């Protein structure tokens, strides 16, 4: 184990975190940062914020918004300076040493957070300001910050007795270590599996691009043949295209049984501990369940409202999902399947039926979605809607050679942000796609600190003979994460904790999901979707097929997401400690959303990173919640034109720039004119008539 370094050792001129960055826009000098720099910087950051908090407490003047709430808000800048790159790299470019540091840092940060929120003297000052809030002449953003600060203290145990505060400290420390261990187990077990195929015939049906990727994967490992693993870009093509049913089954079982086979990475006991620790924390704070605790800071507000949404959607989409299963089974029978369609058959026969029904497939579309062109198209969309431009700057340091950095400006050339793009999978990068911040946006005095944003993907790599070509789903993913980045880059707020994506979890997906709507719009695709070999613009007929296919298997897709939502809520609406079997509990919970036969010894929970290590506990429903919002919001663009400047300006001013400065329903109604309903989503998905 690494030993904790002394603060004295931290105070060296060699540690970049203690210097002003001599880089464009004071971006992070990744080339100078070494793993040994993190721990001393964390320790010094903690020490500095402790001093800042002490200064607030010892201020002899009466507590005011400025000397207490604002002073606390702007404290801890060094801690943020080191924490943002560290935790981003822990997901995007991790290694054993970083993970070891994380194990040491996590309890330090938890204890530090507790030392602030459980500080009686500090809370007393915060409460004095809060109690006289009606008499203070605060603007909207100041009121929001005051309310959020006070609620943060209360929700982090400030009103507890001394004994309960100590219990709270221990529980939060345990919880942070458990969630960290859970995520690391998922990554390690995912990376551990591989299957070498030496006979190409066993991979019949796979597109040439996928075969080349798997061959290159084997070559990197010093092996001959085709190396399969559980990374999404390798796993999905096998499930979609491999004619070999036994191979699909083997890979499916490996993927769906991760972290539940009794080995060192088994997460089932960790799940019990996480769920029970969260319950203890919630009940210590006076809530019946952890979901009750979480939802006080969400648009949904109550568990009943979450279940109302999930139940509404289940009732609307389940009949469609059952029809889809019948269609897939009938199609498989017509193709001499002679078996009941199982989980490892679904993607394979779905892809074939989709290709036959709509004459469109991923492989037909890929040639038109060269990554470089898609990137230009997405950037161009932002320029057309919001007047922002992207200029690549190779002088900005990056954390991996594949990462690119862009300066973002408004139409007048004013600097807005730095955007990093990280597109391809590699060892040390977790699966999925996400947006994050290396630095948030905030103002202090005349200084407007502009954000540094990163979007991370796992798109299929280029091969020796072809550039990186995206699937339509990957184009949609790009737009999704880019929508999050717009929320960060266009932020125009005063306080860091209210800026950018610092909004309620069930609101944060609106800016991302609304961007997905442009993916199938002809006027958008015409700007960039050119065949990578011939330069031919994507044909009108193909665009129409994309639109026709948009609602293919929409019922199944919705039920799958609802299953995740119900499972999340089930784990977090428990009102007594869970001592049962994780897999059985899950099986009973998601049964009403399942249309495929149950597969023994598989489960979602052991690798459900979103809720057990990713911040979506009692919050996975927010994807469907935001889908309702985005369908309702995009209907304004559909009515006025998808590039309509007035609509785009309103969305930017009322949503993208505002961060969490007001309650999200107020912001949404200011843009839309009314509260959202599910009707626009049901119409978009063809569940109800467009005339309704």
Positions of the model-derived regions?
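Bacterial Sec-dependent N-terminal signal peptides
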Residues: 1-13
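N-terminal helix-rich structural modules
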Residues: 12-207, 212-213, 637
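Short, hydrophobic/amphipathic alpha-helical patches that form generic packing surfaces
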Residues: 77-88, 147, 151, 253, ...
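Short pre-active-site segment immediately N-terminal to the catalytic Zn-binding motif
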Residues: 460-479
